[in-house]
């Protein structure tokens, strides 16, 4: 574990500990006290002095990277070069160029790299997508993800760290729209930005797809808790509430994700979320950002 981020302690460490095919070996953090606390809480046998010590540990087969977005590429590439497989938090990189470089590093090293989009593994999300069926391809998709955030010290509000609503939660809305409709041929977008930092606080995007479908996407750090996905089809309208963070109800998508990742590592097979998929998602995020003009 490279880093002791909130999501690691809240979800990923328990998922690995409960998984059928993984175990926790080592953790490092810029905050040693935080690392020691997490190690104690989750029975991690080793607290490393720094990230490089984790990467030098022969007992470590794979690393999970929950670092801020601006550090994803550096530590993914260093981990791959050290012979470790990598499960990296979303978004994979700061832009498509970074994602492409990370994918090349994975191919060059012969080690697996997967983006940690845990919502893709939840049975209720998979059932929603499968239930639409090939003959019920949506005419229109609406996806939203918002929550209130105002603490200026939060990394999500710091542009140099890859902050902003689009990369943090908008990546989910783009992912689900592409999952249902394919790749867009037209992208329009607008954003509300924080005047002091320039970080995008709310983003609206309209996408048109080559198959004729459309999508309206919205993400925000200014709203009350809000997330949903709706698919309008010729046979009806289907909606799913809390599609992106439905933890432990009763399935744990984080555990399903880490088990799938470990299965791919051990079988030397492509991961459930391929690098081509992750790069394509970053390209659409880049197009939205270009339209936002920030």
Where are these regions (language model features)?
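Hydrophobic residues in well-ordered beta-strands that form the structural core
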Residues: 8, 48, 88, 113-115, ...
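C-terminal helix-rich "cap/oligomerization" subdomain common to oxidoreductases
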Residues: 62-64, 210, 260-294
């Amino acid at each position: 574990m490279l880093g002791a981020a909130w999501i690691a302690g809240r979800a990923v460490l328990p998922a690995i500990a409960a998984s059928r095919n993984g175990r926790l070996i080592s953790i490092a953090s810029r905050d040693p006290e935080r690392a020691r606390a997490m190690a104690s809480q989750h029975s991690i046998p080793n607290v490393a002095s720094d990230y490089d010590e984790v990467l030098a540990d022969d007992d470590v087969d794979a690393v999970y990277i929950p670092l801020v977005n601006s550090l994803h590429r550096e530590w993914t590439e260093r981990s791959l070069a050290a012979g470790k497989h990598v499960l990296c938090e979303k978004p994979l990189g700061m832009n498509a160029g970074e994602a492409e470089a990370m994918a090349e590093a994975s191919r060059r090293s012969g080690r697996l790299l997967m983006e940690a989009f845990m919502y893709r593994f939840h049975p209720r999300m998979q059932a929603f997508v499968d239930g639409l069926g090939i003959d019920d391809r949506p005419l229109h998709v609406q996806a939203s993800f918002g929550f209130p955030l105002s603490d200026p010290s939060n990394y999500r509000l710091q542009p140099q760290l890859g902050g902003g609503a689009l990369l943090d939660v908008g990546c989910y809305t783009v992912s689900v729209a592409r999952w249902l409709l394919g790749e867009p041929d037209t992208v329009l977008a607008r954003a509300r930005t924080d005047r002091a930092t320039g970080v995008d606080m709310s983003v609206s995007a309209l996408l048109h797809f080559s198959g004729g479908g459309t999508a309206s996407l919205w993400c925000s750090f200014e709203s009350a808790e809000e997330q949903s996905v709706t698919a309008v089809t010729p046979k009806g309208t289907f909606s799913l509430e809390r599609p992106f963070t439905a933890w432990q109800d009763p399935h744990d998508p984080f555990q399903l994700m880490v088990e799938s990742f470990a299965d791919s590592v051990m079988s030397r097979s492509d991961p459930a979320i391929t690098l081509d998929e992750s790069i394509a998602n970053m390209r659409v995020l880049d197009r939205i950002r270009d339209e936002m003009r920030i």
